[in-house]
């Protein structure tokens, strides 16, 4: 004991020594210290990103917080997206947990390149501050996290803000690439002798596959960003149609990285979930080889589906059909993982702790996000839902609730290991605070993001800081949900610091009062009323797909509820009947390791996807047909307005512009952000060809009731057929980032009889 007391005294003295502090933290090459610094950095960045998200939700709840400054809103949205992806999830997963536990799990004393590990950490920190700087330089980076040209070119984003942002992403990419190379080398070259690949932890496998994805995808992003920065500063024209370039090339390069990036964010979470699930169900993971194969398949297929983010840019229908099929196939290995986790729970003795609660929350919410992903995979349905809040809801269920819940589960699970020291002793989180954190956050994120599905179905475009009054109800509810989520995160912050300050925390009862909401108009929980056969087909296909997805969701929910009811420690106990199957060795082997049951639940999603695919392809090819058009209308997108060109019955070319009517000029009964000075006119029950292009940046011509959403791309002529079945006035909006501080670009279409159509043209 005397030796330990002397050691503790020396440790206490060293903690106050600045040189020892620098040696331990600033220039440390110890993988544990670096992992701790990564984790603390991701918590700090997460606080910044969460505060930005609260600003977004407050703006969307009032519309006046930023005084109508669309560029400032887009700068905040861009910073929020980039921070949460590159500086929260990736540092926590790959920098924090991977650095801490990969060497331990493979029996290595440290990572292969400790100094490379240190520089990787400091590169990501430098990158983070560069990103924050880019938001404050000039007009900021208001391009969205995708940084699409032409909006990101010097013409539309002058100054150095975008250049600094690109430099930040380059440095962050270099940091991730160095880390990936380090982990690959560590696992392959430093794995302890006798540890077979089949016995390597699923977390190690997940990091290994993630590292491969990083090595293969990041150079493509770096190439695209380098081409963009040379377009901005050195007069190259990689993405400028005037010089023979194509802005769609950038989208291909970006999404070839961007979609594997989704799996880079979520795969380490799969590994953490597997570890925690096995621990607190007191069982080995069901079908380990199947789980490894599923993760490998997800990683491989992730490189083959990037263009499902680009269904509206004018891709050939056969190309869209391929990406639809390839994207839906990813649901099969993902389904295998969900079913394998459920099989792990079945028959175990489940202990409900804070990490286990977050894992169960992960399973529920990730499943919902995956099911909506099957909807968006359809090239036909996505035409209506692309760039709406349905997409926002989908990827937040996968990332904000999937990856983030996995991070919280892992942090609570490894909290004592990662934070205990000789100075502070063994530190433990407060279980009650952890549970309060889970339930408030679980409720908060669902209240925030679930209503966004309804906003998307009704056609609310994303990336816009204000919106027609019809959408105010669900936006208010989502904003209340964000406050509940932030309130829950306070319990997390208190919980992780309480063990150090060693003070008791008294939790007082409180209440949140929700004001009565007055829902405007009738755009609430479904699509707008269809006006074309295409929109009717979209609604029918959506309902058809949802029938199968709801069946799957109900089945998974029933199984999970049954498991928690029958096998939870202290809730109930397994009965003799529950464990009867384990008396039979063959049956036991099938439940624990067998392939027969895996084949069965591989076939289940395969059959469901096949049943979904047939009507999906039918609708997709029907949408591509343009049947003997008698009217052709050319639509040109500009910043602030739309231009329309079409001929009358005497073949005279008629041109006019369509600007939004500002709120101060609206007549009584007119709709804010939807009225225009010159409405587009189309004849009913007539086949029409629409030719859509852009005169400056990317735009999106979208009418929810028509089931039409087509990108207007500079240098390209995208066309689509239109057949309006009924008379009426129909509204839409541009759903792309259409310029720096651009005005809203509403679309108003009047569908009239053919005779009245020509009369209105003559008036114009």
Curated annotation (Swiss-Prot):
<feature type="transmembrane region" description="Helical">
    <location>
        <begin position="594"/>
        <end position="614"/>
    </location>
</feature>
<keyword id="KW-0472">Membrane</keyword>
<feature type="transmembrane region" description="Helical">
    <location>
        <begin position="477"/>
        <end position="497"/>
    </location>
</feature>
<dbReference type="GO" id="GO:0045277">
    <property type="term" value="C:respiratory chain complex IV"/>
</dbReference>
<feature type="cross-link" description="1'-histidyl-3'-tyrosine (His-Tyr)">
    <location>
        <begin position="259"/>
        <end position="263"/>
    </location>
</feature>
<keyword id="KW-0812">Transmembrane</keyword>
<protein>
    <recommendedName>
        <fullName>Cytochrome c oxidase subunit 1+2</fullName>
        <ecNumber>7.1.1.9</ecNumber>
    </recommendedName>
</protein>
<comment type="subunit">
    <text>Component of the cytochrome c oxidase (complex IV, CIV), a multisubunit enzyme composed of a catalytic core of 3 subunits and several supernumerary subunits. The complex exists as a monomer or a dimer and forms supercomplexes (SCs) in the inner mitochondrial membrane with ubiquinol-cytochrome c oxidoreductase (cytochrome b-c1 complex, complex III, CIII).</text>
</comment>
<feature type="transmembrane region" description="Helical">
    <location>
        <begin position="121"/>
        <end position="141"/>
    </location>
</feature>
<keyword id="KW-1133">Transmembrane helix</keyword>
<dbReference type="GO" id="GO:0020037">
    <property type="term" value="F:heme binding"/>
</dbReference>
<keyword id="KW-0813">Transport</keyword>
<keyword id="KW-0999">Mitochondrion inner membrane</keyword>
<dbReference type="GO" id="GO:0004129">
    <property type="term" value="F:cytochrome-c oxidase activity"/>
</dbReference>
<dbReference type="InterPro" id="IPR033944">
    <property type="entry name" value="Cyt_c_oxase_su1_dom"/>
</dbReference>
<comment type="pathway">
    <text>Energy metabolism; oxidative phosphorylation.</text>
</comment>
<feature type="transmembrane region" description="Helical">
    <location>
        <begin position="36"/>
        <end position="56"/>
    </location>
</feature>
<keyword id="KW-0496">Mitochondrion</keyword>
<feature type="transmembrane region" description="Helical">
    <location>
        <begin position="202"/>
        <end position="222"/>
    </location>
</feature>
<feature type="binding site" description="axial binding residue">
    <location>
        <position position="396"/>
    </location>
    <ligand>
        <name>Fe(II)-heme a</name>
    </ligand>
</feature>
<feature type="binding site">
    <location>
        <position position="742"/>
    </location>
    <ligand>
        <name>Cu cation A</name>
    </ligand>
</feature>
<keyword id="KW-0408">Iron</keyword>
<feature type="transmembrane region" description="Helical">
    <location>
        <begin position="164"/>
        <end position="184"/>
    </location>
</feature>
<dbReference type="Pfam" id="PF00115">
    <property type="entry name" value="COX1"/>
</dbReference>
<feature type="binding site" description="axial binding residue">
    <location>
        <position position="80"/>
    </location>
    <ligand>
        <name>Fe(II)-heme a</name>
    </ligand>
</feature>
<dbReference type="InterPro" id="IPR014222">
    <property type="entry name" value="Cyt_c_oxidase_su2"/>
</dbReference>
<dbReference type="Pfam" id="PF02790">
    <property type="entry name" value="COX2_TM"/>
</dbReference>
<feature type="binding site">
    <location>
        <position position="259"/>
    </location>
    <ligand>
        <name>Cu cation B</name>
    </ligand>
</feature>
<feature type="binding site">
    <location>
        <position position="734"/>
    </location>
    <ligand>
        <name>Cu cation A</name>
    </ligand>
</feature>
<dbReference type="InterPro" id="IPR002429">
    <property type="entry name" value="CcO_II-like_C"/>
</dbReference>
<feature type="binding site">
    <location>
        <position position="59"/>
    </location>
    <ligand>
        <name>Ca(2+)</name>
    </ligand>
</feature>
<feature type="binding site">
    <location>
        <position position="308"/>
    </location>
    <ligand>
        <name>Cu cation B</name>
    </ligand>
</feature>
<feature type="binding site">
    <location>
        <position position="386"/>
    </location>
    <ligand>
        <name>Mg(2+)</name>
    </ligand>
</feature>
<feature type="transmembrane region" description="Helical">
    <location>
        <begin position="82"/>
        <end position="102"/>
    </location>
</feature>
<dbReference type="GO" id="GO:0022904">
    <property type="term" value="P:respiratory electron transport chain"/>
</dbReference>
<dbReference type="InterPro" id="IPR001505">
    <property type="entry name" value="Copper_CuA"/>
</dbReference>
<feature type="transmembrane region" description="Helical">
    <location>
        <begin position="329"/>
        <end position="349"/>
    </location>
</feature>
<keyword id="KW-0460">Magnesium</keyword>
<keyword id="KW-1278">Translocase</keyword>
<keyword id="KW-0349">Heme</keyword>
<comment type="similarity">
    <text>In the C-terminal section; belongs to the cytochrome c oxidase subunit 2 family.</text>
</comment>
<feature type="binding site">
    <location>
        <position position="263"/>
    </location>
    <ligand>
        <name>O2</name>
    </ligand>
</feature>
